[in-house]
Swiss-Prot record:
Matches recorded under InterPro entries: Ribosomal_uS15, Ribosomal_uS15_bac-type, uS15_NS1_RNA-bd_sf
GO BP term, example: translation
Protein name: Small ribosomal subunit protein uS15c
Protein's cellular compartments: Plastid, Chloroplast
GO molecular function, one term: structural constituent of ribosome
Signal peptide: none
Name of one Pfam family that matches: Ribosomal_S15
Location (main, coarse): plastid
Subunit structure: Component of the chloroplast small ribosomal subunit (SSU). Mature 70S chloroplast ribosomes of higher plants consist of a small (30S) and a large (50S) subunit. The 30S small subunit contains 1 molecule of ribosomal RNA (16S rRNA) and 24 different proteins. The 50S large subunit contains 3 rRNA molecules (23S, 5S and 4.5S rRNA) and 33 different proteins.
Domain of life from the UniProt record: Eukaryota
């Protein structure tokens, strides 16, 4: 999980890192989710990490819903780059 290569992909119009962008925040949450998932495969009874994983999943879901509402094209690009599933719509 290389953070710097993805930062350059996200901020191709800007030369500086745009850490406040929705895409970067979703990217950081995705990395955290993957790390926690690997941790929980080894430590199945770590309930505090399970709670942290659920909270992080909820935060990422809210950010993705916001991005979908604001700009659907950027949402589609992001989920394809990060290789994550689309949101379930009600």
């Amino acid at each position: 999980m290389k953070k710097n290569s993805f930062i350059s992909v996200i901020s191709d119009e800007k030369k500086e890192e745009n850490k406040g962008s929705v895409e970067f925040q979703v990217f950081c949450f995705t990395n955290k989710i993957r790390r926690l998932t690997l941790h929980l495969e080894l430590h199945k009874k770590d309930y505090s990490s399970q709670r942290g994983l659920r909270k992080t999943l909820g935060k990422r879901q809210r950010l993705l819903a916001y991005l979908l509402k604001i700009n659907g094209v950027r949402y589609k690009e992001l989920i394809s780059k990060l290789n994550i599933r689309e949101l379930k719509t009600r």
